[in-house]
Every structure is written in structure tokens, then in C-alpha cells.
Swiss-Prot record:
Keywords: Ribonucleoprotein, Ribosomal protein, RNA-binding, rRNA-binding. One of its GO terms (molecular function) is rRNA binding. Coiled coil: none annotated. The keyword Ribonucleoprotein applies. This is Large ribosomal subunit protein uL15. Belongs to the universal ribosomal protein uL15 family. GO terms for cellular component: cytosolic large ribosomal subunit. One of its GO terms (biological process) is translation. Binds to the 23S rRNA. Residues 37-57 are annotated as: Disordered.
Amino acid sequence: MTTLRLDSLKANVGARRRKMRKGRGIAAGQGASCGFGMRGQKSRSGRPTRPGFEGGQMPLYRRVPKLKHFTTVNSKEFTVVNVAALNELKAGSTINLDTLVKNGVVTSPKYPLKVLGNGELKVKLTIQAAAFTATARSKIEAAGGTCEILD
């Protein structure tokens, strides 16, 4: 058995195709028009046209306005509630997304809960949510409540 050396490597039979020689006579199979069709811009030298070229028509990338921002990829969506909306709830209770849906504060439990700090909180609550803003956390703790972050 021969040793494996770089100068003795060969491709498997049928793994490599021969290069197509274009424009070398009709008998070669790709003579005359070389597989580029009859006439027109796509059959001329210097083909093909550049990407985005639409035959002289104003291309799409120039027709569409330049926008000033990009949407965040994989952005997190939350069900948001302000601390002012929590004043209607019973003092001393534990509040989570299911409790808010039952009490009609939030309509849908589709996304995790995030508590925002708009308004004033007058009741002491233990709130379980996925996220809190800094102002919401300070207002809840100032009212004597606690914030628990859920995963």
C-alpha cells in the first residue's frame, strides 16, 4: 500500500467536470453565441449588468427613501403597566401578570410584564415582573413594597 502524499492525491472519478471552452467552433457545443442567446445587452462583451440595474429605469434602491433608523433585531416585547394603575389593587397583596389580568388592569398575558414608573403608588405591594424601570422600582420601594424579578 502506498503512503498518502500531497503529490499522489487525485479526485474521485466524476467529482470534477472539465472546463467549458466557449467560442471555439460550433462542433465544440458552445461555439458561435457561447450560450449567451441571440442579441441584446446580455450577449455583449462586458456582461452581465451590475446588481440592481433595471435597464435604465430608476432602480428600486434609489426610488425608496433613506430611513433614519433601523428596527432592533430580536427586540424584547413586554406587557407594560404603570405604577399609577396599581393603586386600585388590594394593599399587601402579591401582584403578577395573572393577577393583573384577573383584575382587568391588563387585557392580555401574551408577553412578560414590565412595570413603568409613570404616576404615584400609594399602596404597599409585592410585585413580580420580568422587568422594572428605575423610577418604578424606587416608587414601589418608597411605598413600602418589594420588586421581584421573574425569569
